[in-house]
Amino acid sequence: MKIIATNKKAFSDYIILETYEAGIELRGTEVKSLRESGANFKDSFCRIKNGEVFLLNLNIPQYRNGSLNNHDPERPRRLLLHKKEIHRLLGKVKEQGLTIIPTKIYFNNRGLVKVEIAVAKGKKKYDKREDIKKREINRRIREYLKG
């Protein structure tokens, strides 16, 4: 498994409740661009529309060697999930405060592009501060035990 990009901000801004692996519908130049330069998760999220899951605002830069038929960098991309998973996601999103966010995009062992999406709940400011305090305490304990 070769990781292309991870959404580091998702882990600091959200509490991850459940993760799913989804295929993603891409054009040829998008796959080439992912192999070459990666992707940007800034402000990306998932929406369920007409029984299909779409990944919005994922920026895959245009392929450098592409022609006029190059792709739009921020076009909506369909995620490939089983119907049962889509219904489960729909039920979770209808709960108050839950959202679907992408956490990782990678090539699996067979060379296919996969996206790891997560059902998450947004953190409040005090939750973020608490996490920072815990990390700082753990770091100090490790330093103290080390010597």
From Swiss-Prot:
Places the protein is found: Cytoplasm
GO molecular function, one term: RNA binding
Biological process per Gene Ontology, one example term: trans-translation
Signal peptide location: none
Sorted UniProt keywords: Cytoplasm, RNA-binding
Transmembrane stretches, start-end: none
Top-level taxon of the source organism: Bacteria
InterPro entries tied to this protein: SmpB, SsrA-bd_prot, SsrA-bd_prot_CS
A single GO cellular-component term on record: cytosol
Pfam families, per database record: SmpB (PF01668)
PANTHER family: SSRA-BINDING PROTEIN, TMRNA-BINDING COMPONENT OF TRANS-TRANSLATION TAGGING COMPLEX
Function: Required for rescue of stalled ribosomes mediated by trans-translation. Binds to transfer-messenger RNA (tmRNA), required for stable association of tmRNA with ribosomes. tmRNA and SmpB together mimic tRNA shape, replacing the anticodon stem-loop with SmpB. tmRNA is encoded by the ssrA gene; the 2 termini fold to resemble tRNA(Ala) and it encodes a 'tag peptide', a short internal open reading frame. During trans-translation Ala-aminoacylated tmRNA acts like a tRNA, entering the A-site of stalled ribosomes, displacing the stalled mRNA.
NCBIfam families from the UniProt entry: PRK05422.1, smpB
Similarity field: Belongs to the SmpB family.
Name of the protein: SsrA-binding protein
Organism of origin: Thermosipho melanesiensis (strain DSM 12029 / CIP 104789 / BI429)
The encoding gene: smpB
